[in-house]
Regions:
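Hydrophobic helix-and-loop "lid/oligomerization" segment in the mid-to-C-terminal part
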Residues: 1-70, 90, 141-273
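Short glycine/serine/threonine-rich phosphate/pyrophosphate-binding segments
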Residues: 20-26, 73-83, 129-130
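Short, ordered loop/turn segments at secondary-structure junctions
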Residues: 17-18, 45-48, 76-77, 99-102, ...
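Short hydrophobic/aromatic-enriched beta-strand-loop microsegments
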Residues: 40, 93-96, 112-114
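Amphipathic alpha-helical transducer elements in NTP-driven molecular machines
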Residues: 81, 106, 127-130, 134, ...
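Hydrophobic/aromatic ligand-binding patch that stacks against planar heteroaromatic rings
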Residues: 32, 83-86, 136, 154
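Short alpha-helices
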Residues: 28, 106-157
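Catalytic PLP-binding core of fold-type I/II PLP enzymes
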Residues: 84-103, 160
């Protein structure tokens, strides 16, 4: 169905999530589809106005106003019955790629790509959303896309899935790719975090890179992250990385204020049971 959409010049919407896994997942699919010549755009929902997962109003807007005729979800979708039903009723196919817990009743999507799908026998069930997106990318391009593994490593570590089995391999090679990444946005982020590219580890991703991306999704519009991760404009990458850095500082201030407030609620004379 995706190949058909590309061949016929259809407008494809990649609908992601506002966390680091969703951002990297969407970037992976975007780059893969564009390699095949697709007309596609990415939308990451705003947690304050759109909520989590497929949003019927957003789907309707893109179908009616942007002429979208195929929607591919990444890192969400298995619980999006209402939005997917709306899209299908409007003649728009939805392909779900997700890794979250499977509901008893699955949405009536065109296809569902999920490591725990009851009709599949995929041997490793604990992929992150970006891992599932990477599998889709490899299938579409008919070869392993090693240049995408830096994004896979970030999303997998950020989502705190089990770093065993296939995830361990994806992260290992992804960290190697991060060590000499050509993504100017990641280079800017590493620079602002004071991390040399060749010193990137699981810890630096988990405690420096992932929190920055997550801060954007938690406090503001997450969509600039796509331009950061996939763009080629040095000035734009610097501006977005700086904005994300500032959002992360804001996040830390909020966390600290909550901590200080919580401390005032605790009676120091009272023993914890």
């Amino acid at each position: 169905r995706i190949r058909q959409a590309i061949e016929e010049g259809e407008n494809i919407l990649i609908y992601g999530d506002y966390d680091a896994d969703g951002m990297t997942s969407a970037s992976i699919v975007k780059e893969s589809l564009e390699q095949l010549g697709a007309e596609c755009r990415v939308y990451l929902p705003n947690r304050f106005t759109d909520g989590y997962g497929p949003n019927a109003s957003v789907y309707k807007y893109f179908i009616e106003q942007e002429g979208v005729s195929l929607i591919v979800t990444v890192d969400n979708g298995v619980a999006g019955h209402e939005a997917i039903e709306l899209a299908q009723s409007m003649g728009v196919d939805v392909i779900v790629t997700d890794h979250h817990s499977m509901p008893e009743i699955l949405p009536d999507a065109y296809a569902i790509v999920h490591p725990e799908h009851p009709d599949a026998d995929y041997p490793f069930k604990k992929l992150a959303g970006c891992g599932v997106a990477f599998k889709l990318a490899c299938a579409l391009l008919e070869e392993v896309q090693v240049e995408l593994l830096d994004l896979v490593a970030i999303g997998t570590i950020a989502d705190m899935v089990s770093l065993t089995d296939e995830n361990r391999i994806l992260v290992q090679y992804g960290l190697e790719m991060l060590g000499h990444t050509q993504r100017i946005g990641l280079q800017e982020m590493l620079d602002m975090a004071g991390i040399a590219a060749n010193e990137v580890t699981e810890e630096t991703v988990g405690f420096q890179i992932a929190p920055r991306l997550n801060a954007l999704g938690r406090l503001d519009d997450p969509n600039p992250a796509i331009d950061l991760l996939t763009g080629f404009d040095d000035e734009e990458a610097h501006e977005i990385a700086l904005m994300i850095h500032q959002k992360n500082e804001e996040r830390k201030e909020i966390v600290q204020s909550i901590y200080e407030e919580a401390k005032t609620m605790v009676d120091p004379e009272k023993k914890v049971q």
